[in-house]
A protein has these predicted regions:
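Class A (rhodopsin-like) GPCR signature focused on the TM5-ICL3 interface and adjacent 7TM helical core
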Residues: 22-32, 110-124, 155-167
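Membrane-interfacial loop-to-transmembrane alpha-helix junctions, especially the N-terminal start
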Residues: 43-47
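Extracellular TM2-ECL1-early TM3 structural module of rhodopsin-like
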Residues: 5-17, 51, 55-113
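Class A GPCR helix-loop hinge within the 7TM core
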Residues: 102-141
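Loop architecture of class A 7-transmembrane GPCRs
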Residues: 1, 73-102, 130, 151-190
């Protein structure tokens, strides 16, 4: 008989999978609507939201995919050696952790840029308005935000995760394990 904790964990794993399955087409639909409708192409806020839709399209694949895989697949196996997707390889450890930090920070700052663009569009007497409301400037600022936070989080991609060798005392076999978020320099990004 399953305990209440196992049932709740399974439910949350299923919920994470549903978020991925529903969030992906919803964000793609948002991107399509923001890019294809003619009145939206020159609106600064909508331009930033189109970039935000693409960034938020990838966010569930970092957090929810890891959780859903752990709760729905890895816990059902008899021999559990891997508990998270991040433990599969050093590349997945680095990629998932980098993506998680980069995408969330990038989404937050794109929302800030959209809020500022909306504020500028409402204040007609600001001198910055004539420059800031040009669609090419907004596209460049959006790309600059994405590139800037990609570079800011680059040390996570470089220094996070390490591969260690352990000897299993019961079987006397050597095992290679991936430890994510274990670097001594990682504390600066938390």
């Amino acid at each position: 008989m399953k305990t209440i904790v196992e049932i709740i964990s399974f439910t949350f794993g299923l919920y994470s999978l549903i978020l991925i399955l529903l969030g992906t087409p919803a964000n793609l639909l948002c991107f399509y609507v923001f890019k294809r409708l003619i009145p939206n192409r020159s609106n600064a806020t909508i331009i930033v939201f189109s970039y935000l839709a693409l960034v938020e399209l990838l966010i569930p694949f970092t957090w929810n995919l890891n959780f859903a895989t752990r709760e729905l697949i890895y816990k059902r196996q008899r021999v559990i050696t891997i508990k998270n997707l991040e433990q599969n390889s050093l590349f997945t450890c680095k990629f998932i952790s980098y993506s998680a930090y980069f995408l969330l920070q990038c989404a937050a700052w794109l929302k800030t840029l959209a809020t500022f663009a909306r504020c500028v569009s409402l204040h007609h007497d600001w001198s910055i308005r004539k420059y800031f409301m040009k669609s090419t400037i907004i596209h460049r600022l959006s790309w600059l935000t994405i590139i800037l936070f990609g570079l800011i989080n680059l040390p996570i991609l470089i220094i996070n995760g390490k591969r260690i060798t352990r000897i299993d005392p019961q079987t006397n076999q050597t095992r290679i394990e991936i430890l994510c978020y274990q670097s001594k320099f990682f504390q600066f990004w938390e």
